[in-house]
Amino acid sequence: MTITKQCVGIDISQDSFAACICFSESSQTLHFGETKHFKNDKSGFNQLVRWVRKQCEASVETVYLMEATGVYYERLAHHLHKLKQTVHVVLPNTSKHYFSSLNIKTKTDALDAKVLSQFGVERRHKVWQPPSPILLELRNLTRFYVQLQETKTALGNIMHSKESAHEVQSVILKSNRSLIKSIDKQIEVCKANIKKLISEEPGLNAKVKKVLTIKGVGLITVATIIAETLGFEHFHSIKQVVSYAGYDVVERQSGTSIKGKTRISKKGNRYIRNILYFPAMVSCRFNPELKTTYLRIIQNKPSKMVGQVAIQRKLLALIYTLWKNDSEYIEEYKKEVAPTIKAEATLDSSK
């Protein structure tokens, strides 16, 4: 038996991860080792590396493949990179298509790790590199900004209910107002820190300014999307970005008996969907091209939300296109922002 490729597939969660090794022989035959579970901490990472070294062929490169599931994969990916191991990180929707191609319907940690190891052997993937520290800092700030806004909204709802209730003590109302005022100050500080961080990085600042030429899109919106996608590093098509954000369309239909409403999956990055809500509303009113699109979509539709979501998707596609092409938005010149960008071509793994 001559091993030509070997890949460690890793299915990772908050507290633990499952690992399985797939071996490819010169005859193209695949075989799998046992699946082993480890804790998602430094001790578990070191145990994984020692286990892999015992299981794998020393003369053949060992690669590791995992999904970009939230932030849970990041510590392990960084740990392996520091040890000079080859790491591949794939988008969840990319691996989902591969799972579907194998007609796999069961879902367990062990099975996912096994299939991911096979995915790493059978397809070519881009080698993962640690994202820019600036983008990681930006993501921390933009997520904190969203959390502050959500806290303010929750406090506002409490305030409304207390003001409408019968004989609520004034100390409670005063305390709630004080909390909202404090949150407002923190929001302004967070916004200032986001602006400062971007302005201190000339390359990032220049690209952000070009994206800001889209009417209706503000700095916090662009900063959040760039931070959540880490500068679109692992994205090679608009379809991938749309799916990652949870804007991909789901349709439930079977013959003539079942025909449900078409909707977006929402199985994606909530921070992106959250931050695009208000810019889409503004664009529907003040961006001529997007307003035309919005009015066309909602024509004869009972709900305007269909049009709102379509504009959110459109804005996300525009931001992706301008960022990848390093260009500005030119109003009423559709060819400049058409989704046929030069970065569309990709490796097999991005399909």
Regions from the PLM with identified roles:
Residues T2-S24, L116:
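Gly/Thr-rich phosphate-binding beta-strand-loop-beta motif of the actin/hexokinase/Hsp70
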Residues S26-S59, V63:
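Nucleic-acid-processing active sites and adjacent nucleic-acid-binding tracks
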Residues C56, V127-N140, A165-V168, G260-K266, ...:
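Short, solvent-exposed helix-loop connector elements
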Residues L65-R75:
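Acidic, metal-coordinating catalytic cores used for nucleic-acid/nucleotide bond scission
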Residues H78, K82, H88-K210:
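Long, charge-rich intrinsically disordered scaffolds of nucleic-acid metabolism proteins
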Residues L212-T213, L219, T224-K304, T340:
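Phosphate-backbone recognition surface of nucleic-acid-processing proteins
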Residues T256-S257, Y294-K351:
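Low-complexity, acidic/Ser/Thr- and charged residue-rich accessory regions of DNA metabolism proteins
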